[in-house]
Amino acid sequence: PAEALTDSEFAAIYKEAQKYVGTPYVWGGSTPETGFDCSGYVCWVYNQNGYDVGRTTANGLWNKSQHISEAEAKPGDLVFFEGTYDTPGKSHVGIYLGNGMMVSAGDPIKYANIHSSYWQKYLSGFGRLSK
């Protein structure tokens, strides 16, 4: 199985991720210059940290990740949601920060509690990427 990130690996991912908090949501956006959608943001952050995930959708990231339980989820893993809009499969992805918190490209990119009344009803799984 894929290993959880070390503290220093997570620190590097978090440092990149927090640079863009407050950036507006842009459908299809995948760079700091264009703005980000949820999967564009996650792909950018991980690609900048030595991963090779390319540019894919939330469902594509789900397919590239090892599926883990919430109890196994560690900071730097991905958290997935279904039904946030009308698309088959996973419709939203965020970077799990631990303690029920994530950072993701809503409008704008922001921190959120995955167990809030909104996110809890769409929560559908956790994944761990491998380098």
Regions found by a protein language model. Name each.
Residues 1-24, 121-131:
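Intrinsically disordered, low-complexity
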Residues 23-75:
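Catalytic cysteine-centered active-site loop
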Residues 31, 83-85:
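Structured beta->alpha junctions
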Residues 51, 67-70, 85, 89-131:
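Aromatic- and glycine-rich peptidoglycan recognition patches
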Residues 78-80, 95:
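Hydrophobic beta-strand signal
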